[in-house]
C-alpha cells in the first residue's frame, strides 16, 4: 500500500512539473508581445505620415490631432509635457524658433508590437533637416532621433498615449555592448 501511495505521489509530482514546464513554455514565448495586424500597422503608419506632413507645414494642431487628451510626451532634452494642450503649446513655440524652417523626413519604423489588447508599442527613427542652431549654439544633431510611442486603440481609432524622443549618439551606438560579438 505504501509503495502504491509513494508511486502515485511521484507520478503526481512528475505530472505537476510537466504541466508547469508546459505552461511556462507557452507563456514565455506567446505572451511577450505579438504581431500587429496589418490593418492596425497601416493605421499607425498613417498617423506617423500625418504627423510628418503636419510638421513640414508647421501645423502643430494637426501634429497633435492623433494624441490622447492626456498624452505624455518627453522630448530629446528631457522636457516632459503632459496633455495634448501642453504638447501643442511646446511644439508651436519650437516651430516659431528652432524648427521654423525644418523638414521632418519620413520615419523609419524599427519595431511595432502589441503588448496588450489594443495597446501597441512602436519605435521609429526620424531625421530633421534645416533646424536652426540650438540655444547653446550647437547645431541640431543630424544623426536622427529614436522615438518610442505607445498607441492605444479607442473608439475613434488609434491614438498616441505616450512618446519619448532620444537623440541618437552615433559614436556611442557604435560601441553598443548588446550589439558587439
List each model region and its residues.
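A mature extracytoplasmic/lumenal domain signature
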Residues: 67, 77, 124-128, 149, ...
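Bacterial N-terminal signal peptides that target proteins for export
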Residues: 1-10, 21
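Short, low-complexity N-terminal intrinsically disordered segments enriched in polar/charged residues
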Residues: 22-66, 70, 175-181
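C-terminal segment of classical bacterial N-terminal signal peptides
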Residues: 15-23
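Short beta-strand edge/turn micro-motifs at domain boundaries
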Residues: 144-171
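Hydrophobic pocket/interface hotspot
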Residues: 51, 62-64, 71, 83, ...
